[in-house]
Structures are given as C-alpha cells and as structure tokens.
Design a protein with these regions (language model features):
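Conserved hydrophobic residue
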Residues: 22-23, 58, 138
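Short, cationic-aromatic polyanion-contact patches
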Residues: 4-6, 30, 67-81
Length: 240
C-alpha cells in the first residue's frame, strides 16, 4: 500500500475535522463514499482511518460507521501526543511563530549530565537555548542538546528555523521515538527574564529523550512552558 496515499487521506480528513467540516460527534462519510472521493482502495481508507483513531480524532463503531470525537482544546499551544515540531504546533493553532536563538555552543558531556540525559561521558553536543514566540508572546524556553555525531553541520540559522526539518530532510535521519517526563516547577530567574510569565510563578517542564530509527539517543531537551498556554492531552483505550 503506498504510504503517501493513505497519509494524504489521513491529513485531508484530519484538516476537515479540525476545521469542523466534520463536527464533534458527527459521523464521517461512509467507506464507499471516501473510496470514491479519494479514488483509492478500501484498505487505504481503513489505514487512514486507523491513524485518525490512534490520534484520538475518531472512533470506529462496528457496523455503524466512524464518529468524530475530536474537540479543540482552548488556547493550548502545545499538545502532548505525537512528536510535533514547533512550526507544526503553530500551524495547527493558526498562530504566527518566531524562534529566537539565545545561546548556541558546543559542550562535552560530564558524568553528572550523562546520568541525567542518557548520553555517554565525553560525547560532544550542540547546546542550544531558544525562545519560542507565538503571536508575539514568549511562551516556551527550549534548552536543547543534540549529539554532534548524528546532527553535523548545525548552525544558529537552522536552529532559528527548524532543527527537525534539517535532520529529516537534509540529513535523512528518521526520528522515531520520544520519551517524555512532565513536571511543574517554580519559575527560575531565566524563565522570568525570557518568557512572558504574567502572574504565573511556575512553568510546565517537558523533558524529552529522542531516538532515531536505530534506537540511538540523539537529543535531550528541556522545554519550559508558560502554564497558561500549555495542555497535557493523551488518548487512552481500555483493553480487556
């Protein structure tokens, strides 16, 4: 089955759901209708629908169709779930995105950071600090560490645009898995200086360890979010 075909159908239906062309609790068109509309096989439509089920957009009901269960999540700018880039997040929320690189240097992993990050002692890393702006508000402070061996040629200009786009489309590396830990912490002086904190005295902190197709760690990131614009959202399915 051509991957591009079912992914194109998946993205098309997903956009319609997000635009509420298919509103919450409505039924999607029948399989036969979708097959005719997209000029594809039944298996291709079912693969696209399975992706939407996995993302929490729809729920299948045997013999009764496919119901939309997606609802917009208020003013959230970051939804935990898939591995989503900052630019993708901005597009999903229809917000204007700007990234300002405030630090870009090379560091060597010591024993303390190795224990925390999962990198090996002596590894050479890109150490990057970036402030993420959405519609003019400084809402996210990203502190990134990328293994130079796997991400060569990184520059501040690339960091200000999209590191993941560079990794995937220039270096050709597949980004497969991200392990995340989410906590709420008191805002630091650095948070107060760089983010539009308002009256918030805390930040939502997401720590990521990201792995490539070979299962090798290439990124350790701490993202510090202004809490008024942060949302944790997950999809859980009960298995019997």
């Amino acid at each position: 089955m051509p991957k591009a075909k079912y992914e194109g159908i998946y993205h098309s239906i997903k956009k319609r759901i997000e635009a509420q062309d298919y509103p919450y609790q409505s039924l999607l068109p029948s399989e036969n209708t979708l097959i005719e509309e997209y000029a594809c096989s039944r298996n291709t439509v079912r693969r696209a629908l399975a992706e939407l089920v996995a993302d929490g957009y729809v729920q299948t009901m045997q013999g009764r169709g496919v119901r939309v269960i997606y609802q917009p999540v208020g003013k959230t700018t970051f939804t935990i779930g898939g591995i989503e880039t900052f630019q993708e997040t901005a597009r999903r929320n229809r917000l204007r995105a700007v990234t300002k690189v405030t630090k870009f240097e090379t560091v060597i992993v010591d024993e303390c950071f190795a224990a925390k990050s999962g990198f090996s002692v002596g590894d050479e890393l890109w150490s990057i600090e970036r402030v993420r702006y959405l519609d003019g508000k400084a809402l996210i402070l990203d502190v990134n560490y990328f293994l130079k061996e796997f991400v060569p040629g990184l520059t501040p200009q690339i960091a200000a645009s999209s590191i993941y786009d560079y990794i995937e489309n220039t270096l050709g590396m597949q980004i497969i898995t991200s392990k995340r830990r989410i906590t709420v912490e008191h805002a630091t002086a650095r948070d107060e200086k760089l983010l539009d904190m308002g009256t918030s005295g805390c930040v939502a902190v997401v720590v990521n360890q990201t792995f490539n197709a070979a299962g090798l760690l290439f990124e350790y990131t701490q993202s510090r979010h202004q809490p008024d614009y942060f949302c944790f959202q997950d999809i859980a399915t009960r298995k019997k």
